[in-house]
């Protein structure tokens, strides 16, 4: 009898890490693999990144829209409530033997909470990590306490999960999935990257990704972003490649500032809602540095 394993992905970064595991599970004769796509994958302003999953010839079992129509704390809470209700319905329908989740997104926390109430086993990947300035860490540790199996990237993270009270026999240091994700990729040539991005590299190039600091006041985040852009404006000799901030509260003010900056500095600044994993990683090969607070770099 096949084991029914359900994967959940809600963002481009998360899918990039889960991708090889999902593909391997899809062809395993002992596994009946299901996939739920949610979160910013289904958001137009974040590039409808579910299309990248479909390019991998993976057909999602279900798409769960959680109404990402705003970025205020109230909007996030509303999305979390919708997510919990819709995930619970999906879990009752699929009856998985194991739910596999990764990271610290609030929609993943909603899914984990629904699974906990339904007494469904959860395997959590990339727990035990620390994030300053964001409530990601609180969500991540909360998911840890809800989960049954833990797959971490380092011994330090394993120790932290055990310190949280988890049974050492359920915590496994398997390394970071990002290494596996990058290792087998055939990166694009410089010309291919330029074609995909409709962009011409300059003598100096920086990739800029700034996500909201969810535990920092909205006005302070606005001021910090304005200061960063004012500093970048002085460097006309550098070409700046901006990517979309993730779908956390107050992401819209950051995105709007970036878009306005790129519009008024179009000769050396470009904005992309999503580059896709292959183009993004290939782009890193040809730039001089990464600027911002994203772990993707």
Language model: regions and residue ranges:
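A short, Lys/Arg-enriched amphipathic alpha-helix followed by its capping loop at the start of a domain
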Residues: 21-31, 231-235
């Amino acid at each position: 009898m096949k084991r029914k394993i359900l994967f959940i992905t809600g963002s481009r970064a998360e899918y990039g890490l889960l991708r090889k595991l999902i593909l391997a599970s899809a062809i395993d004769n002992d596994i009946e693999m299901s996939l739920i796509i949610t979160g910013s994958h289904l958001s137009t302003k974040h590039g409808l990144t579910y299309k990248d999953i479909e390019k991998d010839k993976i057909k999602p079992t279900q798409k769960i829209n959680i109404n990402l129509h705003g970025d205020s704390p109230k909007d996030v809470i509303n999305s979390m409530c919708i997510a919990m209700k819709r995930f619970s319905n999906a879990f009752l329908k699929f009856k998985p033997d194991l739910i596999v989740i990764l990271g610290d997104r609030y929609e993943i926390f909603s899914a984990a909470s629904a699974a906990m109430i339904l007494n469904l086993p959860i395997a959590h990947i990339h727990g035990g990590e620390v994030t300053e300035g964001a409530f990601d860490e609180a969500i991540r540790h909360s998911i840890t306490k809800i989960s049954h199996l833990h797959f971490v990237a380092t011994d330090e993270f394993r120790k932290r999960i055990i310190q949280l009270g988890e049974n050492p026999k359920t915590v496994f240091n398997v390394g970071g999935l990002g290494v596996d994700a990058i290792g087998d990729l055939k990166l694009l040539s410089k010309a291919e990257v330029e074609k995909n991005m409709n962009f011409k590299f300059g003598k100096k190039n920086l990739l800029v990704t700034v996500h909201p600091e969810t535990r920092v006041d909205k006005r302070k985040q606005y001021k910090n972003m304005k200061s960063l852009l004012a500093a970048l404006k002085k460097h006309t000799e550098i070409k700046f490649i901006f990517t979309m901030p993730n779908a956390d509260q107050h992401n819209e003010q950051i995105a709007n500032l970036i878009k306005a900056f790129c519009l008024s500095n179009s000769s050396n600044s470009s904005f992309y809602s999503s580059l896709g994993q292959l183009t993004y990683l290939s782009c890193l090969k040809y730039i001089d540095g990464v600027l911002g607070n994203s772990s993707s770099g």
